[in-house]
Amino acid sequence: MIVDEPTGQYYYGSQVAAPIIGNILSEVLPYLDIAMNDENVVKSFTVPDYRGTPVDQASYAIKNLKSNTIRCIVRGNGDTVIDQMPRVGTTVQDGGVIILYTEENASKSTVEMRNFNGMSAKEALAWCERNNINLVMEGIFNKEFENCRAVSQSVEAGKKAEQGSAVTVSFIYKEEIQ
């Protein structure tokens, strides 16, 4: 959908196009037999800045996020968060991880990024969870993790990635592959 030369005081997409898209989706989704509820959406949030926060307060905040599936790993024996991964402003989805560092010399582990090409979202998510990498999934619809395959990724396979960092993987459904 394109809104060409909107008039009036408001001209941003969230104010002009979003209401129209909302109306379209409210009619199209039931036709496609897709329920409109939060259960079908992969939840995500933007990582805040935990640096300078007492580690117990930061880990409590992470464990009590709305999604309740974000894992918190503390590295070091200090009382205050001095660094974090992923960085402030990064998007993290369900099943993700935030690593809090409390000492300058706390180890920052890296992993060799896997080639996700052809993998299902479920397989990619399992690998990322095992390796403490945040997976940002594009193209996933209705939480259907099995019937799709990865076609691209933001971090090249074989490159070193710091644990806690994020990789964006785009998926398409098997019907679209043919």
Segments (PLM) and residue ranges:
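Ligand-recognition elements built from short beta-strands and adjacent flexible loops
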Residues: 1-178
